Amino acid sequence: WARGEDPFPALAATLSESQRGAWAEDLGRLVELGRAVTVEDGTDRAERLADAGRLAQRVFPDHELGARPAGLLYEDCESRGERTDPMEQVTFRRDVETLAGLVDPWVTRSRIYDLMVERYVARYGRGGVCEDPLAFFMSLAHAPDGDAQMLRAAGQDLASGPDPERAAMPGGVSASPRHMGAYLQPVVVGRRASADDNRTDEPAGAGSGGRLTVVNAFTNGNGALQARFHRLLGRQYRQRLARGIRAAWGIDRVLEIQVSTDCNTAQAVSCGVLPPLGLPGEPESAQAVPLSSLRLAHDPRTDTLFLADARGPVGLAYLGLISQHRLGGYLAWLVLLSDPWARLAPMADHWTSRRRRMDPLPDEPVHSPRTVHGRLVTRRQSWIFPAGHVAGLLDRDSAATLVRVASLRERWGIPAEVYVHQHRGPDAVSRAATFDEHKPRYVDLRSPASLLALHGWIDLAAEHLSLIEALPARDQQAGVTPSGRTTALEYLVGLQWPKNDGDMR
């Protein structure tokens, strides 16, 4: 079927009489699902989802595509409340501006991109033109796994620190502007969770108004995370996002690299914000501009590469769900052309931000204070313990466990609510119950049930545990539902820096 078309009526039209007798009823329910979810209330939509899940369990046998109900992706959203734009709040905007200043020198031109330009110039010369861009990108993708230059360039990007000179380098006419996305969580401070909670009423950096803004994690800020929801939020949202992308790229024609099935088919949900770049194996579209119709050229003024046709340069945007570094083959290099920036700022509590700046884990407990810049928290307070220091306090005697954990909290000043990371040794193979050691676990150190769950969660291969303050704690959440209940609130903010003058056409 054509890109964007409802697949179920198209599939129903292909059935033979015998197939229609076996499957027509199921297909009819799926066809109806698309209409029903737009008019029914939340309870009925949930029942529709459960019905589709039961159908998926019959269609996909156990273990064929993973755990049941593999093959089913359903998304929904509903809100009766109105949210104000957080950037209209002076203090929050100031926090975002502070963060932008901190991460600015960390958003630099990638050395992998430099290598791509170097290999292009070696083949086509300065100012040269390649009539077959796909062939060039595939030649890069077919480099051997042990390519020393590629490994060195990737290592330099990972190990590099802030570099204003590389931050000032152009990325090319086809590329995005420098960008960074940040997940920011507002915190209401000045309350105490309970009488036994030893946190101070005003945490460091509370500033005026009794509020903090915590940097939870970084992502990209080119619009990909917003594109993730364009099908849910509708046409006007999609058009506004497309206008914003074209304005930021500084070019009227921006094509979307739509990799609808790479890694998983959920990639397709973000496709469709911009006209697609036609790629081999992708669904056809009347709006697509084939890669084969474009030329790849070198701009000697900026030492960058760009795509163009007879009308002039075109921009590229990759808005997919799958991270750029996980794409394979020629696609990784094509996406690099659209987004040549390394974004490895350590100012967040995400696993990669913490581990990147951390020395070898110690054999003794270590406390790291909160890092604040005015009201902006870029690193939560944390404690690292050898795993035995914590695991040894936990057993099935809940009373004894509570006493020992309370003593640990009092000695180290640990709040009642924390997130726990476990660090397994380099030779560990077992995933145990966690499957992914990078995912933190919320723990209430006052709760026997929470401590018992923590005891069962810790991998036997874990060598160290990190306890990171839960900021906000449950009583510090800044969100409020339409009914007045407190709830978690997190903003995704996209930071973009204006393109270098040499990148504008």
Where are the regions a protein language model picked out?
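Long C-terminal appendages of very large multidomain proteins
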Residues: V273-G278, E284-R505
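Type-3 copper protein
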Residues: W1-A266, L305, P415, V420-R505
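Long, compositionally biased intrinsically disordered terminal regions
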Residues: T261-L279
